[in-house]
């Protein structure tokens, strides 16, 4: 599928001089030299947290030498795909700040295609409950047998935003995977595996 956006390979380091840059307030976000950034392909069933009082499986269980690392944002327990972890709190805050408008690309499997008016509605805004509004751009949708694969581009990163949007749009959601964060693409890294982007 063509995302219509530039990607970088997993071997590229954030902060390296490339045409694709992550920016905040129109300034390039550049981590400190001692900053560690991990890209994890999160599997289903793992909690996105550093410690869980209920002793459930967390994303930290998947990473060796995870001292001082913490997730940049969250993915639900049942959501898979690209999750960044870092030891740089300032960098994490900049990456998550709504003003930064950093895109997230999700691949969702649903029961039926979106019609033109529904695509337009989601690109504007949809009330998703709790006095919050969600929005998403439909990059591409493709039907295979009884299911539809849709690529969605979001910028806000509200809690469970995609799931709440699908509920409001009356779509049955079969799977949800994040495949891109800013210019960083998930690529071919296996589920449950991770890569140090500073290497």
Named regions from a protein language model:
Residues 1-199:
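Basic, flexible Lys/Arg- and Gly-enriched helix-loop patches that mediate nucleic-acid binding at interfaces
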